[in-house]
């Protein structure tokens, strides 16, 4: 499909699960915009600029992926970039209810904005940035969960 889609998140940090969703989306769609969100209600491990850079470096081999930092409403960002579809990763039942509510709210706010749910590959189903941060804060090894560039930035 020659369609522009958006995959949004805080990506603090980007994980191999995120990267799996980005890679698979890039095979399905003409252009994938990875929208790195500034979320004032969270205390990030990395600044917005650092997260954008880490995602860019993690995705550099994907020619149809663009990484952009943003703040504000995702529906407004989607309109600015002429995207009519959002990609959301869902790990399991715990994510589904929240993600459906979010998709319905986004559609209510933006009309034609659709959401496509992609589960991660089985080996990343349990993985989240929150878990990676917790392991890291307790001096655990996160090397198997994040791209190499993230691991280097954490050291």
Swiss-Prot record:
Protein location: Cytoplasm
Catalytic activity, as annotated: (R)-4'-phosphopantetheine + ATP + H(+) = 3'-dephospho-CoA + diphosphate
Molecular function terms, GO-annotated: ATP binding; pantetheine-phosphate adenylyltransferase activity
Principal cellular location given in the protein's record: cytoplasm
Positions contributing to substrate binding: 10, 42, 74, 88
Residue positions binding ATP: 10-11, 18, 89-91, 99, 124-130
GO biological process: coenzyme A biosynthetic process
Cited Pfam families: CTP_transf_like
Swiss-Prot/TrEMBL cofactor(s): Mg(2+)
GO cellular component: cytoplasm
Similarity-based family: Belongs to the bacterial CoaD family.
Role, per record: Reversibly transfers an adenylyl group from ATP to 4'-phosphopantetheine, yielding dephospho-CoA (dPCoA) and pyrophosphate.
Name of the protein this chain belongs to: Phosphopantetheine adenylyltransferase
Species per Swiss-Prot/TrEMBL record: Glaesserella parasuis serovar 5 (strain SH0165) (Haemophilus parasuis)
């Amino acid at each position: 499909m020659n369609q522009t889609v958006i995959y949004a998140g805080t990506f603090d940090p980007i994980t191999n699960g995120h990267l799996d969703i980005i890679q698979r989306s890039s095979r399905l769609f003409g252009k994938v915009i990875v929208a790195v969100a500034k979320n004032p209600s969270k205390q990030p491990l990395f600044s917005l600029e650092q997260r954008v850079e880490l995602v860019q470096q993690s995705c550099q081999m994907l020619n149809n992926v663009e990484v952009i930092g943003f703040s504000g409403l995702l529906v407004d960002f989607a309109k600015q970039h002429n995207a009519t579809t959002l990609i959301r990763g869902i790990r399991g039942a715990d994510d589904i209810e929240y993600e459906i509510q979010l998709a319905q709210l986004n559609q209510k706010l933006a009309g034609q904005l659709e959401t496509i749910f992609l589960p991660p590959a089985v080996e990343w189903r349990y993985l989240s940035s929150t878990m990676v941060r917790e392991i890291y804060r307790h001096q655990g090894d996160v090397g198997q969960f994040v791209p190499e560039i993230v691991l280097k930035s954490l050291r």
